[in-house]
């Protein structure tokens, strides 16, 4: 039948209890024969109390049903909320001349929820019947409006349709662990969209007022999955709008830590521009003041970070050299300073190449995990630039003067294993399991005390903070002078122009 059609009830023929202990009534539709009778759940019989009273002999107590206002002599309507295909489970074939009710444009009647007398008979007649799948609210008080566009793609919707289409097969158990019930209750506190999602994933109500949550094992997995999903949605809704407006990075609030992913939409290979660096600084500022215990920095794509966006530099410095050189140098200074002053542990996951400033900031972080595919290069002298990101101080301290000079002056490339053996990288993982290994270790760190993590970093980094800030200032002053001079700018332009022609 079409979901919007209405059909008129003629009378109730019989009633029964299904395998879940819920009452169903056999409805005779006006204008149709006995072969078209259908079993309808009690909560679908809205505004049909008179038919139920007549069938039960008018012996139902008033406290089990809530009388709704109705006009005497008015025809009773039962709304057809059948959003799913009708399955016909017949004990005998239908007569060839009879057509399905769906072929008739008749109107069917709405009926309110009523509870039958417990002592009534519940045997099903041996006749041609058909089971119908419905979409209902968890409370079972009324039929959900058939607006599948809102919830049709959400988690739990498909599962509820599947379970309801097998209504009465006895395979589902109502028992559930306490934490699952709490999870469903908590999820119901979300906004309209999320509460609708939870409602469609729960199913219909049991007679005793509990919830039919299907199989415990299957339901527990679905609940845990939906709980994590809804928890993130609730957090994003509660955040300040300005905190969510990131164009070139992705910020995720995980349990115990904040995850920042470089995902530049305005530059290639996650190259850095002043605008992108400003977004990272904002994300660091937010993570420093929330309940996160640590910060995870990673990237989307095959390249972690390709350093400064040189095409951006050419365009900006060509238009207004003095003004833009000051602005870009200050953006780099503030970007690096944000890493130096961040009090919580910073974990970096290097999934691919890290070049220039993308590699220079790694010593400012606390733990660096790299994929086997990652490699590191800081060709500052080659591209006519001076070192940035405090690499003029941190690289000699970590790698040794000889290797640091080779990287800064000659642009030597370090593999992940070489960087690990030299102390630039903490540990190297196989590419296929890199993300899983990183997340496992980050979650273990997030289970530690926030105070212990922060104080431990303070003990390790406190004596370096003033030194790094001073080095950062000097490096940015040098970059500003270089970009402000015509000689330094022409040298940069000629190099980048040659690289473009080579490509």
Curated annotation (Swiss-Prot):
<dbReference type="Pfam" id="PF00385">
    <property type="entry name" value="Chromo"/>
</dbReference>
<keyword id="KW-0539">Nucleus</keyword>
<feature type="region of interest" description="Disordered">
    <location>
        <begin position="66"/>
        <end position="177"/>
    </location>
</feature>
<dbReference type="InterPro" id="IPR051053">
    <property type="entry name" value="ECH/Chromodomain_protein"/>
</dbReference>
<dbReference type="Pfam" id="PF00378">
    <property type="entry name" value="ECH_1"/>
</dbReference>
<dbReference type="GO" id="GO:0005634">
    <property type="term" value="C:nucleus"/>
</dbReference>
<feature type="compositionally biased region" description="Basic and acidic residues">
    <location>
        <begin position="88"/>
        <end position="98"/>
    </location>
</feature>
<dbReference type="InterPro" id="IPR001753">
    <property type="entry name" value="Enoyl-CoA_hydra/iso"/>
</dbReference>
<dbReference type="GO" id="GO:0061628">
    <property type="term" value="F:histone H3K27me3 reader activity"/>
</dbReference>
<dbReference type="InterPro" id="IPR014748">
    <property type="entry name" value="Enoyl-CoA_hydra_C"/>
</dbReference>
<dbReference type="GO" id="GO:0035064">
    <property type="term" value="F:methylated histone binding"/>
</dbReference>
<dbReference type="InterPro" id="IPR023779">
    <property type="entry name" value="Chromodomain_CS"/>
</dbReference>
<dbReference type="InterPro" id="IPR023780">
    <property type="entry name" value="Chromo_domain"/>
</dbReference>
<feature type="domain" description="Chromo">
    <location>
        <begin position="7"/>
        <end position="67"/>
    </location>
</feature>
<dbReference type="GO" id="GO:0062072">
    <property type="term" value="F:histone H3K9me2/3 reader activity"/>
</dbReference>
<protein>
    <recommendedName>
        <fullName>Chromodomain Y-like protein 2</fullName>
    </recommendedName>
</protein>
<dbReference type="InterPro" id="IPR016197">
    <property type="entry name" value="Chromo-like_dom_sf"/>
</dbReference>
<comment type="subunit">
    <text>Interacts (via chromo domain) with histone H3K9me3.</text>
</comment>
<dbReference type="InterPro" id="IPR029045">
    <property type="entry name" value="ClpP/crotonase-like_dom_sf"/>
</dbReference>
<feature type="compositionally biased region" description="Basic residues">
    <location>
        <begin position="101"/>
        <end position="120"/>
    </location>
</feature>
<dbReference type="InterPro" id="IPR000953">
    <property type="entry name" value="Chromo/chromo_shadow_dom"/>
</dbReference>
<feature type="compositionally biased region" description="Polar residues">
    <location>
        <begin position="130"/>
        <end position="140"/>
    </location>
</feature>
């Amino acid at each position: 039948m079409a979901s919007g059609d209405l059909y008129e009830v003629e009378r109730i023929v019989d009633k029964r209890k299904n395998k879940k202990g819920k009452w169903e009534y056999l409805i005779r539709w006006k204008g149709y024969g006995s072969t078209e009778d259908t079993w309808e759940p009690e909560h679908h019989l809205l505004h049909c109390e008179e038919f139920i009273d007549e069938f039960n002999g008018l012996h139902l107590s008033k406290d089990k049903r809530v009388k709704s206002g109705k006009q005497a002599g008015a025809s009773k309507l039962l709304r057809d909320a059948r959003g799913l295909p009708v399955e016909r489970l017949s004990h005998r074939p239908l007569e060839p001349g009879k057509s399905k009710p769906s072929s008739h444009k008749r109107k069917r009647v709405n009926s309110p929820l009523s509870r039958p007398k417990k002592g009534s008979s519940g045997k099903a007649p041996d006749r041609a019947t058909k089971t119908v799948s419905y979409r209902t609210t968890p409370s079972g008080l009324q039929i959900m409006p058939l607006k599948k566009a809102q919830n049709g793609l959400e988690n739990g919707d498909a599962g509820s349709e599947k379970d309801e289409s097998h209504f009465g097969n006895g395979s589902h158990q109502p028992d559930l662990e306490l934490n699952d019930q709490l999870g469903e209750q908590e999820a119901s506190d979300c906004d309209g969209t999320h509460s609708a999602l939870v409602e469609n994933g729960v199913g219909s109500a049991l007679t005793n007022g509990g919830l039919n949550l299907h199989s415990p094992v299957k339901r527990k997995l679905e609940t845990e999955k939906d709980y994590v999903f809804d928890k993130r949605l609730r957090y994003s809704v509660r955040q300040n709008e300005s905190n969510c407006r990131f164009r070139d990075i992705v910020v995720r609030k995980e349990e115990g830590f904040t995850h920042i992913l470089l995902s530049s939409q305005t530059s290639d290979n996650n190259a850095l521009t002043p605008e992108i660096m400003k977004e990272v600084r904002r994300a660091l500022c937010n993570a420093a003041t929330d309940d996160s215990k640590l910060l995870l920095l990673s990237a989307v794509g095959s390249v972690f970070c390709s350093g400064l966006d040189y095409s951006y530099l050419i365009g900006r410095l060509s238009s207004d050299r003095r003004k833009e050189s000051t602005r870009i140098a200050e953006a780099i200074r503030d970007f690096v300073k944000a890493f130096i002053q961040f009090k919580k542990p910073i974990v970096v996951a290097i999934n691919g190449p890290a070049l220039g400033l993308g590699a220079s900031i790694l010593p400012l972080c606390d733990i660096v995990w790299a994929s086997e595919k990652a490699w590191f290069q800081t060709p500052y002298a080659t591209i006519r630039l001076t070192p940035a990101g405090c690499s003029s101080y941190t690289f000699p301290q970590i790698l040794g003067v000889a290797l640091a000079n080779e990287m800064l002056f000659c642009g030597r490339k370090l593999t992940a294993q070489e960087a690990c053996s030299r102390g630039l990288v903490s540990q190297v993982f196989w590419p296929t399991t890199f993300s899983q290994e990183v997340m496992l270790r980050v979650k273990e760190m997030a289970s530690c005390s926030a105070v212990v993590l922060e104080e431990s970093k303070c003990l390790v980094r406190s004596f370096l903070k003033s030194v790094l800030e001073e080095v950062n200032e000097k490096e940015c002053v040098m970059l500003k002078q270089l970009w402000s001079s015509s000689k330094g700018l022409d040298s940069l332009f000629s190099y980048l122009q040659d690289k473009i022609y080579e490509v």
